[in-house]
């Protein structure tokens, strides 16, 4: 249930902030997604929940595909699709620009440092096309928020309601879901 709530929170944020969310004005709401562990049930559910709520999910094996998309510059990745949303008569495309499992070189997953490095790579690739940062947990979300999203005023959504993420809401952290 929490996974769907996280996705709905992101969608509600887009609708509430439609006038300012599209940072470069291209009509595409681009988001990046930090995936904790591709084989972990919580990670699978959270990825599916976000993709389902935003309409970017593609059905696979009876559910929304939770496979990392890698980079998706043109919206043609096979594991996600572009979605359309209408906000007060204005239509936006929602696109998952990039997603990856946050696994470090030692094999540890849900890795905050890897997420902090990933946001730097994604920023170099996508720049102001990134309108939202989404993470399967607050540890990775806070790493991306502190490394890039906070200074660039990009809303970041995590999961777990860690105390640092709750405190960061006053600094622009978009939201978090409590387990």
Feature locations, PLM:
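A residue-level marker of the well-folded mature domains of exported/periplasmic proteins
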Residues: 1-179
